[in-house]
A protein has these predicted regions:
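Extracellular/periplasmic catalytic domains that process cell-envelope and extracellular macromolecules
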Residues: 23-32, 88-91, 113-114, 128-132
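Active-site His/acidic residue clusters
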Residues: 16-66, 104-105, 110-112
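Substrate-binding rim/cap in mid-to-C-terminal beta-strand-loop elements of soluble/periplasmic
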Residues: 55, 79-86, 116-169
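A long, amphipathic alpha-helix that forms part
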Residues: 7-24, 51-93
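Second-shell loop/turn segments in exported
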Residues: 2-6, 147-150
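Active-site-proximal beta-strand/loop segments in catalytic clefts of secreted hydrolases
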Residues: 34-38, 46-47, 98-101, 133, ...
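Metal-dependent active-site segment of extracytoplasmic phospho-/sulfohydrolases and closely related
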Residues: 35-36, 72-110, 138
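Catalytic-site neighborhoods of secreted/periplasmic enzymes
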Residues: 1-2, 121
């Protein structure tokens, strides 16, 4: 039902879980990339998620109920994947979470850049400036220090050789 999953977050996640279960039975390493449509326009979320944020006090920049609800849905779906990995005891698994770009700098009705989702970062999505390229990059796995934080810039073009090294090839 599209009303229960307007961005296909949970149907994409269920397909990923099915893939994990199927490949776990093969007892061989596997690679899975999940590319959600969220967080992206159109801003859509489940009705229950909208209700969860409806009574929250908004801030000057963080005032978009739909964006909060959609982010909540995506976060919940990632939790389902983590739960499945734990259930199947897939301890030798690396999870990489990131985004392709920063936010659109100006979304109507915002008139000024200072009111944008990226502020105080410079510009956004289609720019090679901090607001366009500074995105979350989270890695979880057996040889990853859970308390480590780094401000070192990375490039996705360097990611494939790293994944190959992790896989032992």
């Amino acid at each position: 039902n599209e009303a229960d999953d307007p961005k296909k977050i949970f149907s994409i996640t269920q397909r990923a879980i099915n893939f994990i279960e199927k490949n776990n039975k093969k007892s061989k390493p596997f690679f899975l990339q999940i590319s959600h449509y969220a967080i992206h326009s159109d801003i859509l979320a489940r009705g229950t998620s909208y209700k969860k944020f409806n009574s929250k006090k908004t801030g000057k920049i963080h005032d978009n109920l739909g964006l909060a609800a959609m982010t909540f849905d995506l976060d919940e779906s990632i939790g389902l994947i983590l739960d499945k990995l734990e259930e199947l005891n897939l301890e030798n698994t690396y999870l990489i979470y990131s985004s392709d770009n920063g936010s659109v700098p100006i979304i109507t009705p915002r008139k000024y850049y200072e009111e944008s989702y990226n502020y105080p970062l410079s510009r956004g999505k289609w720019d090679a400036t901090e607001g366009g390229i500074r995105v979350p990059f989270i890695v979880m796995g057996p040889r990853v220090n859970k308390t480590r934080y780094s401000e070192t810039p990375i490039s996705f073009s360097d990611l494939l050789p790293t994944i190959i090294d992790i896989a032992g090839n």
